[in-house]
């Protein structure tokens, strides 16, 4: 039996270290995978498994809005991945108020103002009836505009408020937009009628034409027409703005693209294969030499 000499032991240990050094870069290359968040460079010759979590970049593969993102195809020499539902810990998206909700809140305020304008029209129209027996000629009152105009203003304002409370109802939203446009047209008609009232009755407010009592009725009628003219101008602006906001919300409902959040992928455990020529241990070499 041949006993190992000191020189042979040195040669064996040297060959062992050289083989380990040549295997070490190969093991590091097998451990690193593209897109991983960490790299394990343990030089243990035995098989080991490590779970690798990869996050797909947003531009790594195309995503069509409104469709389920497909799993990207990886080469056969790389581990296949599967989707994990949810978000990474600590990466919860910030909860922000959508623009459509902010627009609807503005529409609710404008709708409340429209209701008040409609009530003012009905109230001042009732006061104008008391001046029918004077020399004041209310053309707008003969057409009944303070009443039917005020009713339409109240209806359009109520629909604007209801659209904010039920933002997912397309019927309320479309009805609010349509009635706001109609209210804007009605307020434009009312502006022309009240301007006509003021222009006709303004020549009768001087004391030389009628006694004081009749002149007071004309002054009261002109003052009421002036106030209603101001409210009609306000209603025209509010109805136009409400229609604009309603169209914006309708566009947000019909053309709302889906928000694409990058998915989290988990690769299958990577098993480091053993080298084709495993490193012999010192005891095995000694036994073989014997």
From Swiss-Prot:
<feature type="topological domain" description="Cytoplasmic">
    <location>
        <begin position="1"/>
        <end position="108"/>
    </location>
</feature>
<protein>
    <recommendedName>
        <fullName>Membrane-spanning 4-domains subfamily A member 8</fullName>
    </recommendedName>
</protein>
<feature type="topological domain" description="Cytoplasmic">
    <location>
        <begin position="160"/>
        <end position="174"/>
    </location>
</feature>
<keyword id="KW-0812">Transmembrane</keyword>
<dbReference type="InterPro" id="IPR030417">
    <property type="entry name" value="MS4A"/>
</dbReference>
<feature type="compositionally biased region" description="Polar residues">
    <location>
        <begin position="1"/>
        <end position="21"/>
    </location>
</feature>
<comment type="function">
    <text>May be involved in signal transduction as a component of a multimeric receptor complex.</text>
</comment>
<keyword id="KW-0472">Membrane</keyword>
<dbReference type="InterPro" id="IPR007237">
    <property type="entry name" value="CD20-like"/>
</dbReference>
<feature type="topological domain" description="Extracellular">
    <location>
        <begin position="196"/>
        <end position="220"/>
    </location>
</feature>
<dbReference type="Pfam" id="PF04103">
    <property type="entry name" value="CD20"/>
</dbReference>
<feature type="transmembrane region" description="Helical">
    <location>
        <begin position="175"/>
        <end position="195"/>
    </location>
</feature>
<comment type="similarity">
    <text>Belongs to the MS4A family.</text>
</comment>
<keyword id="KW-1133">Transmembrane helix</keyword>
<feature type="region of interest" description="Disordered">
    <location>
        <begin position="1"/>
        <end position="25"/>
    </location>
</feature>
<feature type="topological domain" description="Extracellular">
    <location>
        <begin position="130"/>
        <end position="138"/>
    </location>
</feature>
<feature type="transmembrane region" description="Helical">
    <location>
        <begin position="109"/>
        <end position="129"/>
    </location>
</feature>
<feature type="transmembrane region" description="Helical">
    <location>
        <begin position="139"/>
        <end position="159"/>
    </location>
</feature>
<keyword id="KW-0675">Receptor</keyword>
<dbReference type="GO" id="GO:0005886">
    <property type="term" value="C:plasma membrane"/>
</dbReference>
<feature type="transmembrane region" description="Helical">
    <location>
        <begin position="221"/>
        <end position="241"/>
    </location>
</feature>
<feature type="topological domain" description="Cytoplasmic">
    <location>
        <begin position="242"/>
        <end position="290"/>
    </location>
</feature>
């Amino acid at each position: 039996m041949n006993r190992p000499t000191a020189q042979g032991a040195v040669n064996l240990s040297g060959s062992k270290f050289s083989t380990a050094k040549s295997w070490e870069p190969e093991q590091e290359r097998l451990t690193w995978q593209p897109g991983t968040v960490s790299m394990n460079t343990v030089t243990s010759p035995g098989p080991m498994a490590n779970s690798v979590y990869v996050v797909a970049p947003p531009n790594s593969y195309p995503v069509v809005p409104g469709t389920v993102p497909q799993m990207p195809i990886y080469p056969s020499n790389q581990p296949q991945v599967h989707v994990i539902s949810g978000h990474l810990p600590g990466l919860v998206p910030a909860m922000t108020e959508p623009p459509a909700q902010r627009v609807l809140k503005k529409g609710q305020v404008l709708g409340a103002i429209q209701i008040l304008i409609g009530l003012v029209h009905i109230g001042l129209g009732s006061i104008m009836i008391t001046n029918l027996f004077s020399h004041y000629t209310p053309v707008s009152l003969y057409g009944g505009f303070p009443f039917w105009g005020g009713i339409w203003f109240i209806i359009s304002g109520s629909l604007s408020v209801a659209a904010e409370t039920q933002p997912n109802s397309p019927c309320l939203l479309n009805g609010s937009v349509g009635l706001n446009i109609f209210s804007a047209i009605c307020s434009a008609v009312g502006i022309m009628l009240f301007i006509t009232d003021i222009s006709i009755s303004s020549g009768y407010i001087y004391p030389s034409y009628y006694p004081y009592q009749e002149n007071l009725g004309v002054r009261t009628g002109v003052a009421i027409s002036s106030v209603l003219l101001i409210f009609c101008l306000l209603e025209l602006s509010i109805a136009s703005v409400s229609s604009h906001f309603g169209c914006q919300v309708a566009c947000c409902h019909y053309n709302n693209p889906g928000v694409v959040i990058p998915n989290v992928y988990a690769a299958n455990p990577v098993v480091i294969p053993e080298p084709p020529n495993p490193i012999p241990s010192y005891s095995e070499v000694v036994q073989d030499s014997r």
